[in-house]
Amino acid sequence: MINVIGVRFRTAGKIYFFSPGQFAVKQGDHVIVETARGVEYGRVVSGPKEVSDDSVVQPLKSVIRIATDEDKRTVEENHQKEKEAFKICQEKIRKHDLDMKLIDAEYTFDNNKVLFYFTADGRIDFRELVKDLAAVFRTRIELRQIGVRDETKIRGGLGICGRPLCCSTYLTEFAAVSIKMAKEQNLSLNPTKISGVCGRLMCCLTNEEETYEVLNSQLPSVGDMVTTSDGLTGVVQSLSVLRCLLYTSDAA
C-alpha cells in the first residue's frame, strides 16, 4: 500500500495522484508539484489515503511544498498574463490568416510554457504562428487542438435545465453517449431537446442509463400481449419506466 493525495489543476479537471511526502497535507490545501508539463499549482481534492501500489502510475512524484502566499500571487499574475497572451495570439492568427478559433491561453505555474487551445475543422499548419509567438513570449509554446466538448468544458455555461454545465462543474472525463440512451429513456429524439451547448448529445443522458437498462429488462415492450394476475389480457400501448407502469388496450 502507498499513501497518496489527489490533486486537481483545473475545475472539473482530471485528478492526479502524488505522494504527500513529509508534508501534513489535507483536503482543500493548495500544493506545488512536479508534472509532465513542469512545476504546477494544484488543489488537493482527496486524501491522504492508502491505495494499492498497482493503482497508481509509478514512480509517484512527491509534493514539493504546500503553496505559500507568494505562490498564490504568482497564480493570479499568470491569470492576468494569460489574458494578454490570448489577445496577442488572436492578433497573430489574423496576421497569418489561419482558419482556427482560439479558445483559451494558459501559463504553466513556472512560466516555462504557454499553452494555447484552439478548435478547427481540419489540420492547421501553425509552424509560422509558433515562431511568432515564441519570439514574443520567449518561452516554450504549445498549440493544442481540442474538440467542441472540450471547448464547452473550458468556456462553461448553462444547460437547458438552467443549471451550470455538468462538464464544467464536476465531470472529469467524457463518457460515450448514444442515441440509444435517449430511446431507452423514452425521450424526444428532436436534436434540439437532447443536444447540449456543444451540439453533441447531452452528457446527462448517461446519468440514468443504468437504471433504465435494469427497469426496461423487467418490463414488456410496446406491442407485447400481457396478462395480469387477475386474468385481464391486453396489448401494451405505452410504458412509464421509472414508475414501473404500463398502459394497455383491450386485446379484443
Model-derived regions: residue spans:
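Conserved small/polar residues in nucleotide/adenosyl-binding loops
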Residues: 247-252
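Short conserved beta-strand and strand-loop elements enriched in small hydrophobics
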Residues: 29-34, 223-229
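Short beta-strand-centered aromatic/proline hotspots
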Residues: 41-46, 233-239
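Short, conserved beta-turn/loop elements at beta-strand boundaries and strand-helix junctions
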Residues: 48-51, 239-243
